[in-house]
Amino acid sequence: METGSSDDDLYKDDPSHPIPYVFNCDIEAVLKDGGADLSIVIASPLGSDTRSLKRLLKKIETYLQFICSEGFRTESGIPTAENTRIVVHIHKKSDPAILRALSQCHEWVVDNNAKLVVEYL
């Protein structure tokens, strides 16, 4: 008997979670001179539980996959860390462990031709 939840359960749509839709882009702003700002909006406090952390990392990974796609290049041009940002708008009362985890994602994002920016709501 399996005791853990499957990835399908972990990442399924959950409107009650601070990251309700892991595989959807919350906001995309294509820039006039190329590139884009892709925003993740976390409007309620995000805890440091394993599920929340995994949902956040999967959402960033989903954005990075989009940035590396042909569809992104068609819409926004060639992505670079100078013209393409993932902006995490996070509730100011989110667990500090989440902010530490985000600080460790900068190199991962840069390696995938974008810049990670964290802003408080």
Language-model segment annotations:
Residues 2-4, 8-43:
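N-terminal, charge-rich interaction modules
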